C-alpha cells in the first residue's frame, strides 16, 4: 500500500483532508442522485483529486479524476438508472478514468464500480484496494447488463 499512499499524496491527499463539496452536492440534487452519509464523507475526503498512474499493460499515463461534475458530462441518467436496476443498489457518480472512458461510482452499499456502456466492474468495498488493482492491472469483477 506504500505505492498507493504515494499516489494519493502526489494527488494532493493528506490525512484529515476535507474539501467543500457544495457544488458537487448541488449537481447530485439536480441530476436526481441520492447519497448517504458515508458517500458524502468519501467525497469530502477525496473530491477533486487527480490520481496519475502508469497502466501496466499499455505503458501509458492514466488519470483517475475524482470530479463527479466533469464525469457526469459523459453519462446520462438513463444509463445510471439501468445500472441501479441491474445491481439493485443506488450508484453515486464520483469520477472517471479518462483514457478508458470509465465512469466511477460508489454504491449506497459501499462498493466501487466502473461503468462503460453495458459493462460494469465491481472493484470491492475498499477505495485504496481498488486503486491498487488499477495500478497493478488487475480487473474488477465484470458484470454485463442484459439490456
Task: Give each language-model segment a name.
Residues 1-102, 143-146:
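A surface-exposed partner-binding patch
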Residues 112-119:
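Short, compact, well-ordered microdomains
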Residues 120-145:
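Compact, glycine/acidic-enriched structural inserts
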Amino acid at each position: 500500500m506504500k505505492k498507493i499512499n504515494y499516489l494519493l499524496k502526489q494527488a494532493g491527499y493528506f490525512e484529515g483532508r476535507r474539501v467543500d463539496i457544495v457544488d458537487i452536492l448541488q449537481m447530485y440534487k439536480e441530476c436526481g442522485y441520492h447519497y448517504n452519509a458515508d458517500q458524502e464523507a468519501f467525497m469530502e475526503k477525496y473530491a477533486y483529486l487527480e490520481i496519475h498512474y502508469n497502466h501496466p499493460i499499455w505503458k501509458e499515463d492514466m488519470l483517475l479524476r475524482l470530479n463527479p461534475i466533469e464525469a457526469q458530462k459523459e453519462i446520462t441518467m438513463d444509463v445510471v438508472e439501468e445500472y441501479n436496476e441491474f445491481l439493485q443498489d443506488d450508484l453515486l457518480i464520483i469520477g472517471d478514468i479518462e483514457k478508458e472512458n470509465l465512469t466511477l461510482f460508489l454504491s449506497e452499499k459501499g462498493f466501487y464500480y466502473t461503468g462503460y456502456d453495458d459493462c460494469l466492474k465491481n472493484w470491492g468495498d475498499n477505495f485504496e484496494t481498488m486503486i491498487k488493482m488499477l495500478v497493478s492491472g488487475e480487473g474488477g469483477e465484470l458484470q454485463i447488463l442484459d439490456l
